[in-house]
Amino acid sequence: LRGWFVGEWRISIRKGICIDEWNVLMRDEAANGAVQEDMKARLTELNENEILLYLGYRGQEYPAEIRKQIERCEREVVTAAQPRLVWRRLPVDGELFSALHLEGKDIRELLEGCSEAVLMAVTLGQGIERLLAKSSVSNMADAVIMDACASTAIENVADNFEFDLRGEVEEEGKYLTDRFSPGYGDLPLFSQRQLCAALDTGRKIGLLLSPSLLMIPGKSVTAILGISDEPKALRKRGCESCSLFRS
């Protein structure tokens, strides 16, 4: 598997965490929270407006035949999707979370006042990759629309997990932040390595990283959320929440 990996620990080794120490931390589930598989990945009805946004529509009219094409492509994407989820809840003052070495002001702000963090990863599976590859050869217009549908679908799965988790956390009398992914704001993209390794995404849901940090399958999401005893204002979705946008 060299060249395709879940987590290559050069970064952590450079920061003083050797592989053996990391493996011990991973096994210490009592202190660091077991990898969870009790909550199912849910793909529900796709939001047509989101699909249109991915396609570049901003409220303008479009022909009936385009609508039919979108509906057909959406059905094919939903049929091909095999959503999978893995997540882990752990204390922010624990050794495992500290070993993640998450950098940046934005993630510190997100987790300020939080006693726990949730690491999550979701994917639509390889069936979507095959569908997109096939359509890119046979019908490029379909390929563009299917890509938009698949992007909407993976966000749908991530949103549904966040919704379900929020309900679970609120039953405990606690509060959940919104999710924050590597590459957002000033959280480096290389944090993907740490998240995928901590969640064992390769074995759990078939999610790997390329040497250039691209997720395989491509329609996948990793993210971090915080759990606090006090409510926290949720950030706006999109570029407005990014420190790079504000600077």
Where are these regions (language model features)?
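Long, amphipathic alpha-helical coupling/dimerization segments that relay conformational signals between
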Residues: 136-186
